């Protein structure tokens, strides 16, 4: 499906353009990164359906390419362990950059998401939003000068308006 004919792909395109603009700041070309992006975007372009998780999958697939993949070892025994986005490991004392204990249980499965299996991850729009927020927080913590993305509040407002059947005011 062409991006302009698919509202999900259209929203993803807006998000991906700003996200990629922010991560493609290296002064020297990175052939591995560009090859990965080329194959990922070619896959996305060919998607006919089941692409609601594509943006999450792309962000996850870029973690090892950018050298910031979290080390997910076996979670320690006992209750209350959280995964710290800033420390890239499990902690008992939850802080601002931690997943909840329940979210921590799902992290290893999420990080196994690939383009081939992403359609099996049945997340609601709200769950995808939470996952996206955590992924972007992780990028901000581990990539120097990675800012808040400006398109997200706008895309979320558009998504909420679409769900409620509202039309946003047009600009003169």
Show the residue positions of the predicted features.
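Non-catalytic alpha-helical scaffolds and adjoining flexible linkers that form interface surfaces
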Residues: 1-172
């Amino acid at each position: 499906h062409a991006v302009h004919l698919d509202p999900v792909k259209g929203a993803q395109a807006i998000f991906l353009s700003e996200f990629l603009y922010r991560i493609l700041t290296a002064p020297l070309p990175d052939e591995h990164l560009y090859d990965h992006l080329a194959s990922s975007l070619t896959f996305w372009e060919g998607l006919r359906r089941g692409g609601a998780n594509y943006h999450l999958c792309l962000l996850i697939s870029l973690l090892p390419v950018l050298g910031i993949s979290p080390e997910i070892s076996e979670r320690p025994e006992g209750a209350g362990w959280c995964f710290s986005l800033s420390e890239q490991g499990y902690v008992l004392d939850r802080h601002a950059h931690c997943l909840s204990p329940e979210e921590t249980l799902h992290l290893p499965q999420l990080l196994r998401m690939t383009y081939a299996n992403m359609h099996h991850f049945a997340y609601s729009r709200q769950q995808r939003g939470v996952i996206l927020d955590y992924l972007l927080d992780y990028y901000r913590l581990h990539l120097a000068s990675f800012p808040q993305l400006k398109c997200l509040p706008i895309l979320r407002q558009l998504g909420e308006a679409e769900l409620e059947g509202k039309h946003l005011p047009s600009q003169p």
